């Protein structure tokens, strides 16, 4: 294994999450600030080493995040699913963007966001959260991947539960597949022009807004849509750090018997 570094992987993750909570999304800015606290960080690594090790430890960070989420919300039977556009550059610069050129299977793409009515170049963040707002699973796909394709992977992580979704996930074939393979009941509102139209169940419609609130908090407090990454691995690591920070702040509220959604005031 080689020499064990004094600045451990957990230290790298902790520093990354702390920077995200403080709104420091520039590594140069972070290490300029750390110069004032050299006595407290005797084994601090260089900025380049931190950048490399944060990319190498984002899977460990996600594994820890899932365990924390399960500790808070492990017995949940109802979940919400939705997607959020992640723009990597302006639409006019999409063809010149070099992100993912060496990894075609992970490269961004042109896509359309129906809720905002805009075209963009980048990725799409898919997430599944419980009714209390705890994100249990998420993934990044190219912007041109339909939301339904993400649901085909959900059946390997969830079972015997109900998932509330919007009309983008409406598919009789998908609903049947999820129920037959993992006993997942996908609740999707009907379209107005459908012959079998039925009014939406109001409690489900209200509960489905929970994940929209999570996305709003991630964008507001943790600046989810701000991106300075040059490569796909760096972007994935940053997204993982932001969502992990969100989960840790919820956990701090959880152990202090405070509302999980008050993430801005978790450390007050």
What is the predicted role of each segment?
Residues 1-268:
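Short alpha-helical elements
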